[in-house]
From Swiss-Prot:
InterPro entries associated with the record: Clx_II_MBL (IPR035680), Glyoxalase_II_hydrolase (IPR050110), HAGH_C (IPR032282), Hydroxyacylglutathione_Hdrlase (IPR017782), Metallo-B-lactamas (IPR001279), RibonucZ/Hydroxyglut_hydro (IPR036866)
Name of the featured protein: Hydroxyacylglutathione hydrolase
UniProt similarity note: Belongs to the metallo-beta-lactamase superfamily. Glyoxalase II family.
Its biological purpose: Thiolesterase that catalyzes the hydrolysis of S-D-lactoyl-glutathione to form glutathione and D-lactic acid.
Single GO MF annotation: metal ion binding
Pathway where this protein functions: Secondary metabolite metabolism; methylglyoxal degradation; (R)-lactate from methylglyoxal: step 2/2
Lineage, broadest ranks: Bacteria, Pseudomonadati, Pseudomonadota, Gammaproteobacteria, Vibrionales
Description of how the protein assembles with itself and partners: Monomer.
Length: 252
């Protein structure tokens, strides 16, 4: 099994550093090079690759400096997005070998048109597509694209760990409880999250099993979720339910 370290950046970003027992590492979505370089120096890591999920600056801002410091580093990212110094463009269904583990690339458009996620070693690095108890805003893609992307990720094994790129869990849970105020699991989990955050601790990684219990955007087939948006939809297809939820969340 590979190990993962979180490197906090900006106000609420997480840069993920994946490493093995030989001190080789990969970083995911390095929006800022400084904390990454500090972590690499502290642990005497060797940077092999950078994985990028999408082109937003808080996910790629540190790439040029990391490439300057490590000229031979592989930069892996979505083939149809403007990523600086990209060496390995990838798309849905491609594989990336990291530390003798095969990571599969999932095309998960919605937040951006070319957004990808990486899954391997029972870990999902999903950028701004899936959050704990939430999902990314639709800056470029359509609601139907995002719905399908979330369904694709939800089809992975329940034990898959979810490494999203932002600490949004507490605010997302507030919305989830507006959707499902009688969801006992949600109520209990919110207390745990508030305790963790009060002590400065991360709520990430989550798991897909947990997300299926707390994330309204993965619960569009649930009667209580459908009921919560019944007045906002023309019909009750899951895509329409998702679209109504996403609009509601944008205004929440």
């Amino acid at each position: 099994m590979l190990s993962v370290k979180s490197i906090p950046a900006f106000n609420d970003n997480y840069i993920w550093l994946i490493h093995n027992n030989d001190n080789h590492c990969v970083v995911v979505d390095p929006g800022d090079a400084t904390p990454v370089l500090e972590c690499i120096k502290e642990h005497d890591f060797i940077l092999d690759a950078i994985l990028i999920t999408h082109h937003h600056h808080d996910h790629i801002g540190g790439v040029p400096e990391l490439v300057r410091q490590f000229p031979s580093v592989n930069v892996v990212g979505p083939e149809n997005e403007p990523i600086p110094t990209l060496t390995h463009p990838v798309g849905d269904g491609d594989f990336v070998e990291l530390f003798d583990e095969q990571f599969m690339v999932l095309g998960v458009p919605g937040h951006t048109n070319g957004h990808v996620a990486y899954v391997g070693d029972e870990k999902l690095f999903c950028g701004d597509a899936l959050f704990s108890a939430g999902c990314g805003r639709l800056f470029e893609g359509t609601a139907e694209q995002m719905f399908n992307s979330l369904q694709k990720m939800a089809a992975l094994p329940d034990e898959t760990e979810v490494y999203c790129a932002h600490e949004y869990t507490a605010s997302n849970l507030a919305f989830a409880l507006a959707v499902e105020p009688d969801n006992d699991y949600l109520l209990r989990y919110r207390e745990k999250v508030l305790h963790l955050r009060a002590h400065g601790k991360s709520t990430i990684p989550s798991t897909l099993q947990r997300e299926k219990l707390i994330n309204p955007f993965l619960r569009t087939s649930e009667a209580n979720v459908k009921k919560s948006v019944a007045s906002k939809v023309q019909d009750s297809t899951e895509v329409e339910i998702f679209t109504a939820l996403r609009r509601w969340k944008d205004e929440f």
